[in-house]
Amino acid sequence: MARVRQEALSSLLSARDVRDLADRLSIRPTKTLGQNFVVDANTVRRIVRVADLTPEDVVVEVGPGLGSLTLALLEAVDRVVAVEIDPVLAAELPATVAARGRPGTSFEVVLADAVQLAELPGPPPTALVANLPYNVAVPVLLTMLARFPSLRQGLVMVQSEVADRLVAPPGSRTYGVPSVKTAWYASAKRAGSVPPPVFWPVPRVDSGLVSFTRRPAPETTAGREEVFALVDAAFAQRRKTLRAALAGWAGSPAAAEEALRAAGVDPSVRGEQLGVADFARIAAHRPGGARAAGEPAGTP
């Protein structure tokens, strides 16, 4: 578990502090940006504790908002880089950290859309800890894992049903594209639930914590984008057999069957029954020249 330094705790934001800050900045949380601010100090300290950080970790936080989780992170680690898309929030956050954060820590804020983010200042990040905006949680998580291979672990808070999809095993009702693509990068598991009342405004859904640990990608001669294109095709028609669902991907049903058999996969199964390693093997046997127009070549 992350060690909180009791001798120099931050002054965390209370529910009243969050509302006062929002009023002063004329901020109203918007559905467009998926904003729901955490207003409970016990919740943010719990998130940091479950994240299992060390002081040496370099943490990247996406969507810091008014800084509730940021301040709790700075109790446990020496450096946090926050990525915020809202210019008003991004401009205010350094002042909040300066006034309330643990002395001697390093903090930077990057004004950017996390999905478009290409680089971060300073040392490579080792952990992602974030209350991700509900409406872009999956693309943000996958983008961060793809662009920052130095991320070895993380804990994200997302809508509960999204959490279920991220950690779902093959064959389960919620298993799908997010499950497979997350598994390409990391092993993921549910790490708890978070009730609506700890947020402002109070959402109509529960939230869930998902922890992940980086692992090597499956062995394959296909690139990541080639595997992901296959996954998208397999789940676009998830009730069909792979022979039928992958006809467009392979060029024909017969070509799809040939690729599946070469990979040791029964053509009559559905995509929801396969793990990420299975998809990696199938992608390596895609018939030559079958790539659709405009589809990018694979990347490791």
Swiss-Prot record:
Write down the CDD domains for this protein, in alphabetical order.
AdoMet_MTases
Instruction: Spell out the Pfam families in the cross-references.
Output: RrnaAD
The entry's localization annotation reads: Cytoplasm
Task: State its Enzyme Commission number(s).
Answer: 2.1.1.182
Q: Which GO terms describe its molecular function?
A: 16S rRNA (adenine(1518)-N(6)/adenine(1519)-N(6))-dimethyltransferase activity; RNA binding
User: Does the UniProt entry include the keyword RNA-binding?
Assistant: yes
Q: Write out the catalysed reaction.
A: adenosine(1518)/adenosine(1519) in 16S rRNA + 4 S-adenosyl-L-methionine = N(6)-dimethyladenosine(1518)/N(6)-dimethyladenosine(1519) in 16S rRNA + 4 S-adenosyl-L-homocysteine + 4 H(+)
Annotated Gene Ontology cellular components are: cytosol
Q: State the superkingdom.
A: Bacteria
What keywords are annotated for this sequence in UniProt? Cytoplasm, Methyltransferase, RNA-binding, rRNA processing, S-adenosyl-L-methionine, Transferase
Binding positions for S-adenosyl-L-methionine per the UniProt entry = N36, V38, G63, E84, D113, N131
UniProt KW NADP keyword: no
Kindly give the InterPro entries that the UniProt entry links to this protein: KsgA/Erm, rRNA_Ade_diMease-like_C, rRNA_Ade_Mease_Trfase_CS, rRNA_Ade_methylase_Trfase_N, rRNA_adenine_dimethylase, SAM-dependent_MTases_sf
The UniProt entry, under NCBIfam families, shows:
ksgA
Q: Report the family membership.
A: Belongs to the class I-like SAM-binding methyltransferase superfamily. rRNA adenine N(6)-methyltransferase family. RsmA subfamily.
Q: What does this protein do?
A: Specifically dimethylates two adjacent adenosines (A1518 and A1519) in the loop of a conserved hairpin near the 3'-end of 16S rRNA in the 30S particle. May play a critical role in biogenesis of 30S subunits.
Name it. Answer: Ribosomal RNA small subunit methyltransferase A
Q: Species name for this entry?
A: Kineococcus radiotolerans (strain ATCC BAA-149 / DSM 14245 / SRS30216)
Taxonomic lineage: Bacteria, Bacillati, Actinomycetota, Actinomycetes, Kineosporiales
